[in-house]
Amino acid sequence: MRAVRCHRFAANSGSSKQISPIREVLCLEDLPLPTLHAEENDKNKVLISTHYAGIQYPDFLQAQGLYQIKPNLPYIPGMDVAGIVIDKGSDVNELSIGEQVYANTALCPDGGGGTGGLAEVVSVSANAVFPIPNNLHLSSVANIGRNYCAAYHSLKVIGNVGPNDLVLVTGASGGVGMATVELAKAMGAKVIAGVSTLNKGSLPLTAGADKVLAYGRDRKVHKQFKLDVKAACKELGHPQGASLIVDVIHGDLFQDALVSSIQPLGKICLVGFVAGQKPIKPGLLLIKEASIVGSLWGRWARENPVEFRNNMNEIFGYMKEGKIKPRADTIFSLDNYIKAFELFENNSGKGNTVISMNASQHSKL
């Protein structure tokens, strides 16, 4: 089978100052086809023929060696898999061969850093596999884990968001940001979507955002963004600020605009730090009695499998009802996988990026 592999990290010794081009560290290889045996370890496993694999910014960061979780080298990137069950262990009763499914490699017992998805055939634990409703196309669910699971965990498990809440989302034109906007609206909340530039504003508007505001890339624009958020909060009936902030950007924006935008006793949920890590000043947070909470859903999901499966069922329920509409915004063939990673290298990724794994069934781009 063919699979994408990373043999070394792009960042030298984890330094963001010396980074090789991403195409120098990833390669498409022929690897042995995984199989299931009668051994105890394989009784609860499933083999999936991968039709689509999701790629998002964390996958790019991971290949650079700059993500929170570093896999052992060499490794196959990709956490999200959508495909067809082609074999299963003797203890797997809830799935059928030929069934279309979504699988999340981060749910396997060792977690694996959420890797292994960019392969034509994937072997995963049955607890990491979820049947896909028949009305959903495989390509549309190939980013559920990186995007919708991260968003749901931030909104519901951490934020307990409901109909009376106001959510501020940064990076709202990206995969996690778009999913956060959609899910927050499905939960009945109002949403302010923050984007780097207004030319990225159409996607969160389509997802249902009540307001779209630009925070730019410099501190002058950050200050204007803070004023714009304050005005938007008042307009949306929350003069004291947002109930929850879901932040994937961090950097200077966090201190310049986000801390002042949270309501007293509110929560700021840190999902990522695309703009880098900056010191946090505690003064205003103390006065507001506001909380900063990290959001990394994989460990929680492995430790709370029943609750997580219920959460997944709720996400799929929103999909069936049309309250959220997962989609593949950009699709590349496996032969052109590097272009997907270069979208994030060039800071031009928008929405959901997907690799079509089966060249015989899916046209190349």
Residue ranges, per PLM feature:
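C-terminal capping/lid region of NAD(P)-dependent oxidoreductase domains
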Residues: 1, 316, 323-330, 338-365
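Eukaryotic N-terminal low-complexity, Ser/Thr- and Lys/Arg-rich leader segments
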Residues: 1-24, 30, 358-365
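Glycine-rich beta-strand-centered segment in the early N-terminal region that forms part
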Residues: 32-55, 66-108, 115-116
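NAD(P)H dinucleotide-binding glycine-rich loop of Rossmann-like/cofactor-binding domains
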Residues: 61, 104-171
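Glycine-rich phosphate-binding loop and adjacent beta-alpha segment
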Residues: 113, 195, 252-323, 356-365
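Mid-domain Rossmann-like dinucleotide-binding core that forms the NAD(H)/NADP(H) cofactor-binding site
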Residues: 142-218
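Adenosine-nucleotide cofactor-binding segment
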Residues: 185-253, 307-308
